[in-house]
Curated annotation (Swiss-Prot):
NCBIfam families: uS2_euk_arch (TIGR01012)
PANTHER family: 40S RIBOSOMAL PROTEIN SA
Subunit and interaction comment: Component of the small ribosomal subunit. Mature ribosomes consist of a small (40S) and a large (60S) subunit. The 40S subunit contains about 33 different proteins and 1 molecule of RNA (18S). The 60S subunit contains about 49 different proteins and 3 molecules of RNA (28S, 5.8S and 5S). Interacts with ribosomal protein S21.
Gene Ontology MF annotations: structural constituent of ribosome
Lineage: Eukaryota, Metazoa, Spiralia, Lophotrochozoa, Annelida
Low complexity bias locations: 281-302
Keyword Ribonucleoprotein among UniProt keywords: yes
Keyword Cytoplasm: yes
Entries under InterPro entries matching the protein: Ribosomal_uS2, Ribosomal_uS2_C, Ribosomal_uS2_CS, Ribosomal_uS2_euk, Ribosomal_uS2_euk/arc, Ribosomal_uS2_flav_dom_sf
Cited PROSITE patterns: RIBOSOMAL_S2_1 (PS00962), RIBOSOMAL_S2_2 (PS00963)
Disordered: annotated span: 277-317
Protein name per its UniProtKB record: Small ribosomal subunit protein uS2
Cellular localisation: Cytoplasm
Length: 317
């Protein structure tokens, strides 16, 4: 299909993406209508899908999607959790109407219910899991595009894109490539420049891991928004010093001089009173002496005692 046009030819980088996401690996069982897309079979029974035919079907499906004038008339569905994020991203970039999760029976056929829709084109992730919308689409003549594995039933499927629709990365890659080709056909993006949207955005993410990452980002944002203490001129600043364990060894202590007058000279309040050296004599009262107008009596000189109560006889007998 795209062999004669170099612009639509399969690029080496796209083949690398197919192989990295294991989009070429099918199931062990092969439906009789999917045999034309099987390239070979491995010794363990796994079928190998021809990626060139996968690419051609991606281009065909993109042309069918781009032919719809109103993008909201395109309904993309995924009941499997692995394809719900990819469906929402595809609808975000192309303007389609997503139905992620459980499909309410009667959405396409029951005109009484609130969620009634009349789409012009239906794109599903797995025709086996999404059998209810595929069956209802056959009742109201809605064409169906589906990502099909080697064991997927092709009943009521108009355009089958052979790929591994059981792998997380393969499902995200196929929706990413389909969205990129639709935007290229519409002229929104150029074929000369790579699409700035990463394929990782279409991959399924565990809700618990996503919640942990959101909490970590919120904590980091709150930490950055916290007011920081600003230093002002009135604020005192103390430089950090070394810790001293023994303060007595660091502080010099001056020696205390011993006064010649004894304790009384150091503790008396009247410094005109001379120091008292004879502790047997009564202390003079400076207050009475000052009242009488007489000078204070001089302290008596200490007498030396020569006799200690014994005789000087030399006879000890």
């Amino acid at each position: 299909m795209s062999g004669s046009i170099d612009t639509l030819a399969l690029k080496e980088e796209d083949v690398t993406k197919f192989l990295a996401c294991a989009s070429h690996l099918g199931a062990n069982n092969v439906d009789f209508q999917m045999e034309q897309y099987v390239y070979k079979r491995r010794p363990d029974g796994t079928s190998i899908i021809n990626v060139r035919k996968t690419w051609e079907k991606v281009l065909l499906a993109a042309r069918a999607i781009a032919a719809i004038e109103n993008p909201a008339d395109i309904c993309v569905i995924s009941a499997r959790p692995y394809g719900q994020r990819a469906v929402l991203k595809f609808a975000h970039y192309t303007g389609a109407t997503p139905i992620a999760g459980r499909f309410t029976p009667g959405t396409f056929t029951n005109q009484i219910q609130t969620a009634f829709r009349e789409p012009r084109l239906l794109v599903v992730t797995d025709p086996y899991t999404d059998h209810q919308p595929v069956t209802e689409a056959s009742y109201v003549n809605i064409p169906v595009i589906a990502l099909t594995n080697t064991d997927s039933p092709l009943k009521y499927v108009d355009i089958a894109i052979p790929c591994n629709n059981k792998s997380i990365h393969s499902v995200g890659l196929m929706w990413w490539m389909l969205a990129r080709e639709v935007l290229r056909l519409r002229g929104t993006i150029s074929r000369e420049v790579p699409w700035e949207v990463m394929v990782d955005l279409f991959f399924y993410r565990d809700p618990e891991e996503a919640e942990k990452e959101a909490q970590a980002e919120q904590a980091a944002a709150e930490k950055d928004k916290a007011p920081k203490e600003e230093f002002t001129a009135d604020q005192a600043f103390t430089a950090p010093g070394t810790e001293v364990s023994d303060w007595a060894s660091e502080v010099p202590v001056a020696p205390v001089p011993i006064l010649a007058g004894g304790v009384d000279a150091a503790t008396t309040e009247d410094w005109s009173v001379p120091a008292q050296s004879d502790w047997t004599a009564p202390a003079a009262n400076p207050a009475n002496a000052a009242a009488a107008g007489a000078p204070a009596p001089a302290p008596a000189a200490a007498t030396t005692t020569e006799s200690w109560g014994g005789s000087g006889a030399e006879n000890w007998g």
